[in-house]
């Protein structure tokens, strides 16, 4: 949380006007995400818990920041709907929470991905993994032919 606090302090200080953060709790509804080996915890539930706690922390410490959650309950949101929420609220910062799984049981800690405009292989791997949820959606025409399995 210290990292997020530092980012918010810098960004809010630089912005004289209102500032909006959209927090996206990844997965949800019929998309469970990763499931833990031992406790069988579902990623969607952990993501929602972390996202809600982060939103509360931001609101407590920075009441001038407008915090918007993409979901506050266990519902499935299409990727397009998540993007619509970000765009409709003119987000200055978009934070997407995921609690990824690892085959190595000794693995622990946090991952932070900041996807820029460079076409790095790691960015493509993350995008392909996270966009695979599109396969669960009924209407994929909103993506105008985007293939979640393609590296292009």
Where are these regions (language model features)?
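Bacterial N-terminal signal peptides
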Residues: 7-16
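Catalytic-core regions of hydrolytic enzymes
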Residues: 19-149
């Amino acid at each position: 949380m210290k990292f997020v606090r530092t980012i918010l302090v810098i960004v809010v200080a630089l912005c004289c006007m209102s500032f909006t953060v959209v927090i996206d709790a990844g997965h949800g509804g019929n998309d469970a995400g990763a499931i833990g080996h031992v406790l069988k915890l579902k990623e969607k539930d952990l993501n929602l818990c972390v996202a809600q706690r982060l939103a509360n922390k931001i609101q407590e410490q920075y009441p001038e920041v407008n915090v918007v959650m993409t979901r506050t309950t266990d519902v499935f949101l299409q990727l397009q709907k998540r993007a619509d929420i970000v765009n409709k609220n003119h987000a200055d910062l978009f934070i997407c929470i995921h609690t990824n799984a690892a085959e190595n049981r000794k693995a622990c800690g946090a991952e932070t991905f900041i996807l820029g405009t460079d076409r790095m292989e790691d960015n493509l791997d993350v995008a392909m993994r996270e966009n695979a949820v599109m396969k669960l959606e009924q209407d994929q025409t909103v993506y105008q032919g985007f293939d979640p399995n393609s590296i292009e």
